[in-house]
């Protein structure tokens, strides 16, 4: 019979010698009730009961009094209490962190001016490099909007439709973290502005710097260990990636933020003794992302589009009061093309 022990005042479950943290188990419930936002879980989350049911384990979480069932084989396959070898930020040059106060200074430029004047184009591209996003206004032809904007610096890569039901908003997140490489630029427009659906933006670099100031140990945990992301929702596709939530260059410069709990797979690349620290930082990062002081909210009116750095800026949506679905259209491009165009303009101006 499997050995079952609840330890550390309910924070740890031991199964056949393998230890699992309560918060890790709660984050990986197998009944479709994975928390939409990690920050909403109780800070004093623990285990009140664990009962063997055949080849499965029934666990009760406190203080939620929520029961979840885990297959023993699944726990064995995802065990992280095993010896693993491990070894061990500053903002990149030309980048400026921002928070809610930046809402009154959103960079924007009209498309005709971007096409006509290299100085305007340079300032607009430089704003994306500095702040991670910028608006385009005065888009006349909706069908050609993406082609015209992306053609300012790169070939169009990929077009997709994105719909959001009116009754639900979307927590800020980076797009497609399961892709490798992750799409680095995202261009977004609202096809029906009259239905609402304001955009929420968060500077992931600013959140990372804040976490580093508050909890250096937790910051190191998120930069030194991989998270896993997966999307198997489409038939014939199984997309997976394995990267840090906060990725640094070898010299310590902030490089990429990958944060999207919707596509997070079980964390198994963190030592048992580091898992609580990891989740403490993961949870705090989620709280910062959801904090109004780190967010700006802006509408996308008719004839407007938003280009954002998907390796830095987290994007969400506010819920709409309309009974109809808001409809957004987006496409991806690669940031190296933008930086190349920017460098060429810097050399010529």
Task: For each feature predicted by the language model, list its residue ranges.
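Fe(II)/2-oxoglutarate
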Residues: 1-126
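Active-site environment of non-heme Fe oxygenases that use a 2-His-1-carboxylate facial triad
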Residues: 10-12, 92-123, 129-133, 138-139, ...
């Amino acid at each position: 019979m499997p050995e079952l022990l609840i330890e550390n005042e309910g924070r740890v479950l031991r199964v056949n010698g393998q230890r699992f943290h309560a918060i890790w188990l709660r984050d990986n419930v197998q009944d479709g009730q994975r928390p939409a936002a990690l920050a909403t879980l109780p800070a004093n989350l623990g285990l009140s009961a664990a009962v063997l049911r055949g080849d499965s384990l029934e666990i009760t979480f406190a203080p939620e009094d929520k029961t979840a069932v885990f297959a023993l084989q699944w726990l064995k396959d995802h065990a992280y209490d095993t010896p693993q070898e491990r070894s061990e930020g500053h903002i990149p040059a030309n980048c400026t962190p921002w928070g809610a106060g930046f809402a009154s200074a959103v960079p924007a430029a009209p498309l005709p001016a971007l096409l006509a004047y290299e100085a305007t184009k340079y300032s607009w591209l430089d704003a994306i490099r500095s702040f991670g996003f910028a608006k385009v206004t005065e888009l006349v032809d909706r069908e050609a909007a993406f082609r015209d904007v992306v053609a300012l610096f790169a070939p169009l890569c990929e077009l997709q439709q994105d719909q959001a039901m009116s009754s639900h908003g979307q927590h800020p997140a980076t797009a497609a973290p399961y892709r490798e490489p992750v799409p680095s630029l995202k261009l977004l427009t609202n096809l029906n502005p009259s239905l609402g659906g304001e955009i929420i933006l968060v500077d992931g670099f600013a959140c990372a710097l804040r976490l580093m100031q508050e909890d250096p140990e937790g910051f190191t945990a998120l930069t030194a260990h991989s998270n896993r992301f997966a999307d198997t929702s489409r038939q014939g596709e199984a997309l997976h990636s394995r990267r840090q939530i906060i990725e640094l260059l070898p010299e310590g410069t902030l490089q990429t933020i990958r944060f999207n709990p919707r596509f997070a797979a079980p964390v198994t690349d963190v030592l048992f003794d580091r898992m609580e620290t990891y989740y403490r930082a993961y949870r705090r990062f989620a709280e910062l992302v959801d904090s109004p002081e780190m967010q700006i909210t802006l509408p996308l009116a008719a004839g407007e589009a938003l280009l954002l750095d998907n390796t830095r800026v987290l994007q969400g949506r506010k819920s709409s009061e309309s009974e109809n679905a808001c409809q957004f259209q987006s496409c991806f491009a690669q940031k190296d093309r933008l930086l190349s165009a920017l460098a060429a303009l810097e050399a010529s101006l």
